[in-house]
Amino acid sequence: MLRLSESEHWNINAHFQDFPDEDHFSIPHLATYAGMKFFYSFYKFEEMIDYYHPTYSDRSDIVERIRTHYQLISEKMGYEVKPMQSYINTWAYGLSHFERPDLAIQLFDYNIELYPHHSSVYNAKGYFLLNTGKEQEALKLFYQSLSIKEEEGIRKVIEEIELSRN
């Protein structure tokens, strides 16, 4: 008898996992979870940790690596998948805490490139610049944000900046 795995036509992307301590009633959720983890193993962006580690301080290709990763995801899924705004902002703020403002700025700019019609991407970069003492650049971004969506909180931030400058 020929085993499927020995067939010349074997090209099925499959994985077998035994659950010896489970029974008919406990296995469905565990097996479904394991299957989803297997089929979407390509989704996780594990390379991000490289940029937080001091030995990788010379790395500056963060946007290109993220772009390449999400192109791979898009190809596998069959439609365009973009990183969420919140992910990019979280990575950017994380990098700023690790004293990598150069990379943080790249990520904020990438977020603006991906989501140019979302006010929140301008706010995120604006707050970052404000916290690094670049008030004039921050003001431009806050005004850009308001041109997309009026927000009372951002209007107050602008007023405070302008009052402090006088």
Where are these regions (language model features)?
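C-terminal catalytic histidine-bearing segment of alpha/beta-hydrolase fold enzymes
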Residues: L2-V63, G78
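Helix-start (N-cap) detector for alpha-helical repeat units in TPR-like alpha-solenoids
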Residues: Q85, P101, S119-S120, E152-G153
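Alpha-solenoid helical repeat scaffolds
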Residues: N89-T90, S120-A124, R155-I158
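Short coil turns that delineate tetratricopeptide repeat
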Residues: P116, K149-E150
